[in-house]
């Protein structure tokens, strides 16, 4: 007997999915490059990139080919064994960065969880069992597990789940004096995003990151860079630490690492990695052949002069459009960020209305993001075409006009 097929609509979400998201009223069904189409065939220019994930756009031929080829070979084997795609990708990351060891997980949360566990364990076994303090920053975002959401400095995400992990201190971002006031020899790690993405697209100052490096060295603490959102070419360098010239002890990567396929990584030195041993940590799916094959293909394209050297010109094209919109509608108080992670802060009269602009953008046929209630965020493909930038920003201008009532 045939099973009756019920139509899938936005209402289906409310009937079957846990209510932890509030998705748009339309359902995307197809993507190509920087364009997306919904169930009704409406086209959108995508400047959201799945929240800085689809770094090469949708359905890039090289990634599709890697997926198909590996999908016909070996999907999953578990970490009882190793596999060739994981070892190839690990070697590429090590050769391109400060790191000497890497471990693969499936999401930014998992990569950060791994980093925080390693930082604490390293301090305990190399220094003292009382060296457990983690210093992090207000408005940071590091994931949704209980540990990572507690390190993230946003109570709206971390409150309401009972006792939190102890010895986590939050201080203002870009405030080195505040860090000095709480830093001591009980500190095992300072955890920072070089660019706070969810927290408003705010970049660290060079002096701040250099100061953190010096404080960590002084107190034998590890400097952990969360580059889940700002890494993998987003800033115009492969990783943001390269732009700043400040080398962390541990770095986490996810999002763009797989170009849209779930994978994350934690990178560190051989000395720090040696604190872990078999059984210290693990993941059933982490480093599976399918994810690593796709990520390897993405890495080979992103880590090229053709891509990285083109990012600043694309950024300037976005900024020029945003400045033109601001001149016409007087809506932005600041345009900031780095590379193709761009934030546009709303003026006081539009504070709290970022999602209004987001929804109006979708109605006009362009996907954008917010970064909190007061900042519009753009995280497009790193290879977005100039024509897509121009058309998408024209659509966004129409959205702005609608919201401001022009």
UniProtKB/Swiss-Prot annotation:
The record's section on SUPFAM superfamilies has:
PLP-dependent transferases
Cite the entry's keywords alphabetically. Amino-acid biosynthesis, Aminotransferase, Arginine biosynthesis, Cytoplasm, Lysine biosynthesis, Pyridoxal phosphate, Transferase
Biological process terms from the Gene Ontology for this record are: arginine biosynthetic process via ornithine; L-arginine biosynthetic process; lysine biosynthetic process via diaminopimelate and N-succinyl-2-amino-6-ketopimelate
Provide one Gene Ontology cellular component: cytoplasm
Residues at which N(2)-acetyl-L-ornithine binds: 144, 283
Q: Which PANTHER family does this chain map to?
A: ACETYLORNITHINE_SUCCINYLDIAMINOPIMELATE AMINOTRANSFERASE, AMINOTRANSFERASE CLASS III
Give the function comment from the record: Involved in both the arginine and lysine biosynthetic pathways.
Name of the protein described by the UniProt record: Acetylornithine/succinyldiaminopimelate aminotransferase
């Amino acid at each position: 007997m045939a099973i009756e097929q019920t139509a899938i609509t936005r209402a289906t979400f409310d009937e079957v999915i846990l209510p932890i998201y509030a998705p748009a009223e339309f359902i995307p069904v197809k993507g190509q490059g920087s364009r997306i189409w919904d169930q009704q065939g409406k086209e959108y220019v995508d400047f959201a990139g799945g929240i800085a994930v689809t770094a090469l756009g949708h359905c890039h031929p090289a990634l599709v080919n890697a997926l198909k080829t590996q999908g016909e070979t070996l999907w999953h084997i578990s970490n009882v064994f190793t596999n060739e795609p994981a070892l190839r990708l690990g070697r590429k990351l090590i050769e391109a960065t400060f790191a000497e060891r890497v471990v693969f997980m499936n999401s930014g949360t998992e990569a950060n969880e791994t980093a925080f566990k390693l930082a604490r364990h390293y301090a305990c076994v190399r220094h003292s069992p009382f060296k457990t303090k983690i210093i992090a920053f207000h408005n940071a975002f590091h994931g949704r597990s209980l540990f990572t959401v507690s390190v993230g400095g946003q109570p709206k995400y971390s409150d309401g789940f009972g006792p939190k992990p102890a010895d986590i201190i939050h201080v203002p971002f870009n405030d080195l004096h505040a860090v000095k006031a709480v830093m001591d020899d009980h500190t095992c790690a300072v955890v920072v995003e070089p660019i706070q993405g969810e927290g408003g697209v705010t970049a660290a100052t060079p002096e701040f990151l250099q100061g953190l490096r010096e404080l960590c060295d002084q107190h034998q603490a590890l400097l952990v860079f969360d580059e889940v959102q700002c890494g993998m070419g987003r800033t115009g360098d492969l990783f943001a630490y390269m732009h700043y010239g400040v080398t962390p002890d541990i770095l986490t990567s996810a999002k763009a690492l797989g170009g849209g396929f779930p994978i994350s990584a934690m990178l560190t030195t051989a000395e720090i990695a040696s604190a872990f041993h078999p059984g210290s940590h693990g993941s059933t799916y982490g480093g599976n052949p399918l994810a690593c094959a796709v990520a390897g293909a993405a890495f080979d394209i992103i880590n090229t002069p053709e891509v990285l050297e083109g990012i600043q010109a694309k950024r300037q094209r976005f900024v020029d459009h945003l400045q033109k919109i601001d001149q016409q509608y007087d809506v932005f108080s600041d345009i900031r960020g780095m590379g193709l992670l761009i934030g546009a802060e709303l003026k006081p009269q539009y504070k709290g209305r970022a999602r209004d602009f987001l929804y109006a953008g979708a109605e006009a046929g362009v996907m954008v993001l917010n970064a909190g209630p007061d900042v519009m965020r753009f995280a497009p493909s790193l290879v977005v075409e100039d024509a897509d930038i121009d058309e998408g920003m024209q659509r966004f201008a129409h959205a702005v006009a609608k919201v401001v009532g022009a």
